[in-house]
Design a protein with these regions (language model features):
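N-terminal Rossmann-like NAD(P) cofactor-binding subdomain of oxidoreductases
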Residues: 2-196, 203-205, 294-296, 339
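Predominant activation on well-ordered alpha-helical scaffold segments within soluble catalytic domains
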Residues: 18, 155-162, 211-215, 258, ...
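C-terminal substrate-binding/catalytic lobe of Rossmann-fold NAD(P)-dependent oxidoreductases
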Residues: 28-65, 170-171, 176-304
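Secondary-structure boundary/capping motif
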Residues: 153-154, 253, 312-313
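C-terminal helical cap and adjacent loop that interface with cofactors, partners, or active-site loops
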Residues: 281-340
Length: 340
């Protein structure tokens, strides 16, 4: 049994992590560390988890124990920089669910997050944990940068095409739609029900922090053209739906495209290739990423759907943790979807 610490475990992603940990046969002690929530009982914050998790005290982030085997860090950007370097120095395994270690270049992080990166050397040892796509040597991995929610939905659906047909691409862009839980638990006027009910709106147009993260990985796969993503809010709590449009400079073989996707995800436990564009309800409450690829003339339309809190955060983090300890990657992960 392993001991686990969740630093910043009182948000939406922390709640999902707690549920998965409670369902995991290889996880023993779980400690939750918080800032303002320190000193509270866990079930005071999450009464819905009664009979699911132990009602322990939330500990202060100023007194993080060295005794855990692995740490999930689910803090706002910038704050993880205060804790992760010392944990790595002590030989601990860390999975960061925030954005502080996703970039390869510290200057790119500083440009988009407006924060000086105080542990840039760790960017050289971190692994970008897109677990369903990259073949990571987890036996030698200390620090996993868990991908963002939008990047997960886009990269899993688009990377197989980029890797095999990058020289055919003229333009590529994505429209993504997210539930309001992606903004976290802090009170925001624009997230009130009276603001979002029956409403859809774009936000952070040409300025979303996930755009350079996605671009970084697409460029590694061979993308030569520019990339853009336009993010929108949906009047739902959970889920991300992404539609990527690729304009080609030449015709390609549709069967070959589908074959490449089938080959890539043939053994995947959590990526499902669909014959029709997925519905968001197919994946909400699950760790699945559902993908459909349509090729017609010189246009490729790729749609994907994920649960932003699970596949886009805690579920993928649990997959990465399982891989780090050579467990079955499905352990602990709960799939309670509306429909599948």
């Amino acid at each position: 049994m392993i001991s686990l610490g969740i630093i910043g475990g009182t948000g939406y992603t922390g709640k999902k992590l707690l549920q998965f940990c409670a369902n995991h046969p290889k996880i023993g002690d779980v400690a939750v560390y918080g800032n303002n929530s320190a000193g509270n009982r866990l079930l005071n914050l999450f009464p819905e988890l009664m009979n699911t998790v132990n009602d322990t005290n939330i500990l202060s982030v100023e007194n993080i124990s060295d005794e855990h085997d692995i740490y999930f860090v689910a803090l706002p950007h910038g704050e993880a920089l205060n804790y992760i370097p010392s944990l790595i120095q002590k030989g601990k395994k860390v999975i960061d669910l925030g954005g502080d270690y996703r970039f390869d270049d510290a200057s790119e992080y500083e440009k988009w997050y407006k924060i000086e990166h105080s542990s840039a050397k760790l960017l050289n040892i971190k692994k970008y944990g897109l677990v369903d796509y990259y073949n990571i040597d987890y036996s030698k991995t200390e620090l996993i940068a868990n991908p963002g929610c939008y990047p997960t939905s886009v990269l899993l659906s688009v990377l197989p095409f980029i890797e095999n047909f990058s020289d055919s691409i003229n333009t590529i862009s994505t429209c993504s739609y997210s539930g309001t839980s992606g903004a976290g638990k802090s009170a925001k006027t624009e997230m009130l029900m009276s603001e979002m009910d029956g409403n859809v709106k774009a936000y952070n147009v040409n300025n979303h922090r996930h755009q350079p993260e996605i671009t970084q990985e697409l460029k590694k796969a061979g993308l030569q053209s520019d990339y853009s993503i336009t993010t929108h809010l949906l009047p739902v709590a959970v889920g991300i739906y992404s539609t990527t449009t690729i304009k080609l400079n030449k015709s390609i073989n549709t069967e070959l495209v589908i074959e490449n996707y089938n080959n890539k995800y043939a053994t995947s436990k959590f990526v499902r290739l669909r014959q029709i564009p997925p519905s968001l309800t197919w994946v909400v409450g699950t760790n699945f990423c559902d993908i459909n690829v349509s090729v017609k003339h010189n246009t490729v339309i790729i749609t994907s759907a994920i649960d932003n809190l699970i596949k886009g955060a805690s579920g993928q983090a649990m997959q990465n943790m399982n891989k780090m300890f050579d467990f079955d990657e499905t352990l602990g992960i709960i799939n309670n979807g509306v429909t599948q």
